[in-house]
């Protein structure tokens, strides 16, 4: 019977009745197991955009496995922690300096590992027309079940453009590539790499990989970090009347009416 699972010092460890067994997490992931692909690429290892970040990095010595490292990231988090201590439900103490050093080293090591996986996954997509051809081929399996859209925390449009018949023809499978282009155009700059669009895809299309690869490129271009930077991303707000006037003034019939 398995009692506990954890990742510690580069090992995936299973504790069972009478002992434990560990295997290199690198070996596991090279073989296609281990963490989800999007988690491997993630560089947000300590969620400092939250009020409190809790984990075991930095907990050492006799407290290892028995205590939690709590990093206070906001005034609200500090107040919550103080109130818990006052209520007697929590006991705190200053972190061990050695533990802080180890915590920093572990976090930096995980950043490097994330960079390694990004390089591995993104280079596998190719560039330019080769990347586009790969995405078109992979998404040709799409059955338009809408799991990628319904599960996306960023996609919250009241009226979804992928359901407009003049953009995506009803009843056609696979849907024309406009279906995918709409998703990329709406989500790519704000993708937080949660992986749900890939996790729930009935046809095993690597949607999260495609979206994350585009998000990283857009982040390099515009500097917006989704999930961290709370300012509005580029072109987040458009005044409809002014935009209509601008489009009309171009005199081009190649400009699509985005308000239709």
Model-flagged regions — what are they?
Residues 145-147, 194-195:
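A short acidic Gly-Thr/Ser loop motif
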């Amino acid at each position: 019977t398995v009692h506990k699972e954890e990742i510690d010092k580069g090992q995936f460890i299973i504790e069972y009745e009478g002992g434990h067994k560990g295997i290199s997490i690198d070996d596991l992931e090279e073989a296609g197991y281990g963490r989800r692909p999007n988690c491997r690429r993630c560089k947000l290892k300590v969620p400092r955009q939250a009020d409190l970040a809790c984990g075991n990095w930095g907990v050492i010595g006799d407290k290892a496995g028995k205590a939690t490292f709590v990093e206070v990231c906001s005034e609200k988090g500090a107040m919550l922690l103080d109130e818990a201590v006052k209520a007697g439900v929590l006991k705190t103490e200053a972190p061990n300096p050695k533990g802080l050093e180890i915590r920093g080293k572990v976090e930096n090591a995980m950043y490097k590992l994330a960079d390694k996986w990004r390089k591995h996954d993104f280079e596998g997509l190719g560039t330019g027309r080769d990347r586009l051809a790969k995405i078109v081929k992979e998404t040709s399996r799409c059955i338009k079940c809408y799991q990628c859209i319904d599960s996306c925390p960023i996609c919250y449009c009241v009226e979804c453009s992928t359901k407009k018949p003049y953009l995506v023809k009803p009843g056609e499978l696979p849907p024309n590539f406009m279906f995918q282009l709409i998703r990329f155009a709406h989500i790519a700059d704000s993708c937080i790499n949660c992986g749900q669009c890939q996790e729930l895809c009935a046809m095993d299309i690597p949607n999260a990989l495609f979206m994350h690869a585009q998000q990283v490129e857009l982040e390099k271009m515009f500097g917006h970090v989704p999930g961290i930077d709370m300012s509005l991303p580029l072109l987040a707000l458009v005044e409809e009347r002014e935009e209509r006037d601008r489009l009309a003034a171009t005199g081009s019939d190649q400009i699509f009416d985005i308000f239709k």
